[in-house]
Amino acid sequence: ILGITIPPLKQFGPLLVVWGMAMLMLIVIRDLGSSLMFFGAFLALLYVATNRASFVVVGLGMFSLGAWFFSSNLAYVQDRIDIWRDPFARGVIDNEGYQIAQSLFAQADGGVLGVGFGQSLLALPGGGTIIPAPDTDLIYAVIVNELGLVGACAVLFVYLLIAERGFRIATLARDSFSTLLAAGLTAVFALQVFVIVGGVTKVIPLTGVTLPFISYGGSSIVANFVLLALLLLVSDRARREATSP
């Protein structure tokens, strides 16, 4: 179909198991972002290991179908979808939709060049904040507000460069384990950026995933530094093996 060969049904067993785990995460943790990161990283590893795009196509279809089913049958998932669709609706913008609405207002206020570094209005004179969670969930909105479209694109370019180098390290690795390790770590990193930036810009529903190396949070920063260290380890080992006689 469209140049994609569908493998035998029995080979989809691992995909079904991980899909079930991702859907369980969606039910128990109630976090679409974490579920998407988990399943997306698995699809990336599956593609690298098998070189079959059919697994990715079927996997994306399964995840979309599962997300649609649970959004139609679980109230809290449906509420999250409704807020994402129209955060400016009457009765929503002052409650559940306040966070994403203020995020969009802040980004629009930033314009092309931004209002200036450290010049965003985060706190109201009488107390409270205009942008909720400005150092964690919505820190990308603060970046767009202060540095504008140019600064926001520069931040995304840095992330894109890290992801490109990570996947290149995966292609240069000398053994299958190192290849899968580098590809999996890079996929997790890229998906983490996509989930938080996509949520802040209203591409996907907003979740509580942190922006790598920028959002406040000790464990998140340590985890991402460990991720980069492992990528550097794989890269160094591949370089040494390539230059050794």
Language-model segments: residues:
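Long extracytoplasmic/lumenal interhelical loops at the membrane interface
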Residues: 112-150
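Membrane-helix interface and discontinuous TM-entry motifs in multi-pass inner-membrane proteins
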Residues: 19-33, 108-126
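A juxtamembrane structural motif centered on a specific transmembrane helix
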Residues: 192-245
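Short beta-alpha connecting loops at secondary-structure transitions
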Residues: 66, 123-124, 214
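Re-entrant/interfacial helical elements at transmembrane boundaries that shape
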Residues: 37-38, 118-126, 158, 201-210, ...
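Hydrophobic alpha-helical transmembrane segments of multi-pass inner membrane proteins, especially
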Residues: 1-99, 137, 141-199, 226-230, ...
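Transmembrane helix boundary and interhelical junction motifs in multipass membrane proteins
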Residues: 31-36, 115-120, 134-136, 153, ...
